Regions:
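Extended, hydrophobic alpha-helical membrane-active domains that insert into or remodel lipid bilayers
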Residues: 330-331
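Small-residue-enriched transmembrane alpha-helices
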Residues: 278-327
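Conserved GTPase G-domain substructure that encodes guanine base recognition and part of the catalytic core
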Residues: 1-88, 93, 98-282
Length: 331
């Protein structure tokens, strides 16, 4: 029987318990860890029918452990809820299938965005708007952003909305996509840049917000066989982590899809994997390790990474995170 996978919180707890820190400092760190562990991330995905919300969710997160449910009132809610313990995904129905249906969906989106969590803050931390990069008619999505999301989120809209341009592989009807290397050629790459530039300008014109769209491909399968691997998913994940509160970033670590192929291809404009690790480290430092004694050695070797390699202040706790992130996204 295989050993049950430990959560990032359990690994961090073990690191602290096995450290040479004074007992009082251990207790303080464990208390802080309990606070961090209680934080839950809520992400909402919205978009037109066929934009690829479900494929994006499945590509990014480990949905095998998701508990499927609905909103507070199962009788009336049409927004699907996927509960992955510290991460909750709210998947809204696709827009564009009828005026009355769209009104019903937007009404529920507004209601959900107005909900408050137990801490009195907005329940939804982030809204990811998925657009179809191959579509010339994005009017429904612009209406959603301009007339629903921005008014509902108010002054926090710019930091709580991410725009994803999915289906980059078929943006030019399947042309100029290098299947062997799983990336666009220069022609398609320029097309996608212009598409993103156009969407960005249109949103800024309508709302005043400067939101940079991320072109990506969630990947897909047909008849059980994979037809296209994900592309630029690392860039989208990095954007999500950057835009959720720092104290909640650890919640994503346990729920990242473990298929390394999903994180193997991107535009290489930045090292998104390394940037993601740094953002997670910031979260660990902010939430747990303020004031750690220089030279404290937490954990010795965990997941094959010596604590002192990272440095005395962060020690093996960050080593834990390094190991987990590397095992998921690759070195």
């Amino acid at each position: 029987m295989s050993e049950e996978k430990k959560t990032i919180y359990e690994l961090l707890e073990a690191d602290i318990m096995n450290s040479n820190l004074p007992e009082a400092e251990k207790a303080a760190k464990l208390s802080r860890l309990i606070q961090v562990r209680s934080k839950q991330v809520n992400i909402m995905l919205v978009g037109a029918t066929g934009s690829g919300k479900s494929s994006t969710i499945n590509a990014m997160f480990d949905m095998n452990v998701a508990k499927v449910g609905v909103g507070v009132d199962p009788e009336t809610s049409i927004i699907s809820k996927f509960d992955l313990d510290n991460l909750v995904i709210w998947d809204t129905p696709g827009l564009g299938d009828g005026v009355e249906r769209d009104k019903e969906i937007t009404r529920e989106i507004i209601e959900k965005l107005s909900e408050l969590g137990e801490d009195g803050k907005p329940l939804i931390d982030l809204v990811v708007v998925i657009l179809d990069s191959s579509s010339k008619d994005l009017g429904t999505s612009y209406e959603l952003i301009n007339n629903v999301l921005v008014p509902a989120l108010g002054s926090e809209a710019e930091k709580r909305i991410i725009i994803g341009l999915n289906q980059a592989d078929v943006a030019m009807k399947g042309k100029h996509w290098n299947k062997e290397e799983n990336k666009p050629d220069d022609v398609l790459k320029n097309f996608l840049k212009e598409k993103a530039k156009s969407v960005r300008a249109r949103i800024k014109e309508g709302t005043g917000l400067d939101l940079e769209p991320i072109c990506y491909c969630a990947g897909y399968s047909e008849d059980g066989e994979e037809q296209c691997k994900p592309y630029n998913l690392t860039k989208l994940l990095h954007a999500i982590i950057q835009n959720i509160p720092r104290e909640k970033r650890l919640a994503l670590v346990d729920n990242i899809n473990t298929d390394k192929d999903n994180w193997s291809y991107d535009d290489e404009e930045e090292d998104y994997k390394e940037d993601t690790k740094k953002d997670i480290f910031d979260s660990v430092f902010d939430c747990m390790l303020e004031g750690a004694e220089a030279g404290s050695e937490l954990g010795g070797k965990l997941l094959g990474i010596p604590g002192r390699i990272i440095g005395g202040v962060l020690g093996g706790v960050v080593g834990s995170v390094v190991g987990v992130i590397d095992s998921l996204l690759g070195d």
